[in-house]
Amino acid sequence: MGTTNIRLEGYEVTHEIVTGFKVYRNQVQVATIEKRNNEWIGAITAGTKVMMFQNERFEEVLNKINKLTV
């Protein structure tokens, strides 16, 4: 997975574990990823709409964000 320009910034901590991330590409926030009910939920904006997707694996959500925000 080509995530060279991707940077994660934790912004939410639950029980000393980071459960919320802002996702940046080239210094611009492009998405968020949060853990809810044992699943990771990713959200990006596409024009005026918000696209959301979820998976049990963090890497799958990050990969989807990477593909959709190129």
Label every model-predicted segment.
Residues 32-49:
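Short aromatic-glycine-(Arg/Gly/Cys) micro-motifs in beta-strand/loop hairpins
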Residues 44-46, 54-70:
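A short, charged, amphipathic alpha-helix used as a generic interaction element across diverse proteins
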Residues 7, 18, 42-45, 66:
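Residues marking helix boundaries in flexible regions
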Residues 9-11, 37, 41, 62:
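Alpha-helical context
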Residues 1-26, 52, 56:
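Negatively charged, low-complexity tracts enriched in Asp/Glu with abundant Ser/Thr
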Residues 21, 25, 34, 48, ...:
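Generic cytosolic/nucleocytoplasmic N-terminal low-complexity/intrinsically disordered segments
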